[in-house]
Amino acid sequence: GNRILLNILQSIEAVSIPASLLIYGLSTSDALSTYGVLTGMALPCILFPSALTNSASTMLLPAITEAQTQKNVQRIKKMIRSSLCGCIFLGTGCLAGFFLLGPALGRLLFHSSLAGEFIRTLSWMCPFLYANSALISIIHGLGKTGISFLLNTLSLFIRIIGVLYFTAYWGIPGYLHCLLASQIFLFVTGILYISYHLRQMLLSSHYNT
């Protein structure tokens, strides 16, 4: 049920982007072209390195679950610290690379200067985007799938609001900035929840002893 709702929200987001670009004033062909450049060229570039973080996150989940079962807070903290540092390090490197080389990549790979502009703008998402895959896996590993669903849903709502309001008034830059805002939201709330959960575990173990 949760997965279906997320898919429905993602579909609403996808359908709303060209519609909001029409309201902004683009022609139908320009709106669809801009949407195609964003989703078919720029975003795949930004998401490509996340294959590494997604693989690492998949391996992280059972390790976190095991440590949670053992109530080993220190081990969980160590895994969280190392995984987040790795993701943020990769994300910062990709931010620098995509920001500096975005226009060149757009021309070289897609023969599109617009794709290059999008890659450069989206580069700011990289540290948060890559770290969030680890954060969501950690929350799953802690047995809190409902929390990860809630955070993902709220993040999607930020993007949908961005499409319906900011894209209609400011064009595609409005949507790109809301994409960044949604990833920052997911990152901050994920960190806050994990910190809260670990504090509760420590308190619980303290009272049990």
Residue ranges and their predicted role:
Residues 2, 35-42, 78-91:
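Junctions where cytoplasmic loops transition into the N-terminal start of transmembrane alpha-helices
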Residues 18-47, 116:
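Interfacial/gating helices of multi-pass transporter permease domains
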